[in-house]
């Protein structure tokens, strides 16, 4: 029953947020296009529920041609970030197009962040912990408890804790904590 309620909540909330944020998202898309060559959106291959690969949209914050790896694995990440990209990442505005993924059911508002398709160690650890059964989220328990600063075992432990304890009240708490962290720009390293 919880999963059905969560899906309905996700759908309605994503629809409302897209309606409210539609114009600002169009402005962001225009700024991305004006400040660097290429499309406004970047579709990243991510690992979803039950390890199914899906395309996750983000506002493009890196130059076209950047290798599709986690930012911290790039030799010089700052050389790949567009003029507006650093701001988009620090403010988490680059994540807004993921509301589309929530709307179509590839993601949830709250759940473990979807791994990149080539993060084999994270994918294996999550599968071993049963976390792969969850729909990935725009935010999650690991996001509000360390975000980019956490090593993989700690992320997976927090994801597994969310799997065991998930509830509507925990989701609301995570959403509130996320809003607070975004406003304070906590835990963003790139």
What do the PLM-derived regions correspond to, one by one?
Residues 1-4, 76-80, 95:
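Juxtamembrane loop-helix boundary motifs flanking transmembrane segments in multi-pass membrane proteins
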Residues 1-64, 101, 168, 173-190:
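A hydrophobic, helix-centered structural microdomain
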Residues 18, 72-76, 132:
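Residue-level "hotspot" positions that anchor or transmit function at local structural transition points
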Residues 39, 67, 74, 88, ...:
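A helix-centric hydrophobic-segment signal that preferentially recognizes long
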Residues 40-80, 138-157:
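Short, glycine-rich, amphipathic interfacial segments at transmembrane boundaries or analogous
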Residues 47, 97-190:
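Hydrophobic structural segments characteristic of membrane proteins
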């Amino acid at each position: 029953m919880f999963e059905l309620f969560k899906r309905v909540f996700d759908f309605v909330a994503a629809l409302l947020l897209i309606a409210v944020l539609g114009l600002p998202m169009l402005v962001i898309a225009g700024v991305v296009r004006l400040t660097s060559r290429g499309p406004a959106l970047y579709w990243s291959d991510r690992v979803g529920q039950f390890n199914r690969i899906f395309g996750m949209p983000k506002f493009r914050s890196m130059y076209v041609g950047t290798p599709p790896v986690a930012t911290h694995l790039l030799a010089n990440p700052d050389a790949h970030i567009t003029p507006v990209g650093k701001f988009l990442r620090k403010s988490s505005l680059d994540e807004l197009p993921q509301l589309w993924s929530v709307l179509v059911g590839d993601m949830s508002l709250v759940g473990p962040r979807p791994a990149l398709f080539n993060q084999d160690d994270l994918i294996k650890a999550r599968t071993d912990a049963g976390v792969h059964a969850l729909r990935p989220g725009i935010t999650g328990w690991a996001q509000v408890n360390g975000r980019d600063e956490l090593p993989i075992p700690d992320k997976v432990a927090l994801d597994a804790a969310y799997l065991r304890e998930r509830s509507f009240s925990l989701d609301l708490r995570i959403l509130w904590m996320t809003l607070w962290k975004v406003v304070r720009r906590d835990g963003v390293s790139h």
